[in-house]
Amino acid sequence: MPELIINGPEGRRIEARYHHEAKSDSPIALVLHPHPQFGGTMNNQVVYALYHTFAARGFSVLRFNFRGVGRSQGIWDGGPGELADAASALDWLQIVKPDAKCCWIAGVSFGTWIAMQLLMRRPEIDGFICVAPPSNLYDFSFLAPCPSSGLMINGDNDRVVPSSCVADLSAKLKTQRGIKIDHEVVSGANHFFENKIDDLTNVVGSYLDMRIAKDADEREQRRAREKEREAARERERQRENEEVVAPVADTDDD
């Protein structure tokens, strides 16, 4: 997998890895890594697993290092700068795949906090995956309302982010009309999902399969409705044309 350098905010370099799908309308996904000051990088095993879970389902996928990590330029900014990095990465991904049929974002721990802020700013994001969202450490109240449906997943042996905190966050978001938040707990998993990566990818993969099938069905229904509307418009045009060309009754008296 070749190294990729993309342009970030203020001309800074961002180190990334990219999986490209040849189909012009392939869906896209952006994956954000855990806290840089606690060893988080784009090569984190959970980030890597999410990246390949998306790729296995036909997504074009991008993961990258936040500023100051690896070969990405800059220094840790506590959130605003990292959000700008993520926005630049999504911009790049959308330039490469302008015809993508849908857009997803995923994050791990600190990366979920950045991912969800980006979700609020980018209405084109259709779904999300949040792994161990640290709602006990960061304020997620900006998700009011949450604009997209998605999955939150954590381990029940997580000593960094208690499962109850993720459950509370998920429950709050479920109150939004038209938004469905799924919450899954992986038994025995800690914050880093050590020895539980397969369980994690099985849950995420099943969720993506469900959403992909559902979204495809909804797109087909929309196409069918639009086809019917166009047929109705065509019938109306034909009726109007027939009225215009209909012969006028002869009113001359012989």
List where the protein language model places each region:
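Catalytic active-site module of serine/aspartate enzymes centered on a nucleophile-bearing elbow/loop
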Residues: I197-D254
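Serine-hydrolase catalytic machinery in alpha/beta-hydrolase-like enzymes
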Residues: N7-K97
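Primarily recognizes the serine-hydrolase "nucleophile elbow" in alpha/beta-hydrolase
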Residues: A84-P147
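Catalytic histidine-centered segment of alpha/beta-hydrolase-like enzymes
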Residues: G74, A189-T201
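Short alpha-helix in the alpha/beta-hydrolase fold that links the catalytic acid
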Residues: S148, P162-K172
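Short beta-strand/loop motif that positions the catalytic acidic residue
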Residues: C146-N154, D158
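Catalytic histidine neighborhood in serine/cysteine hydrolases
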Residues: L173-F192
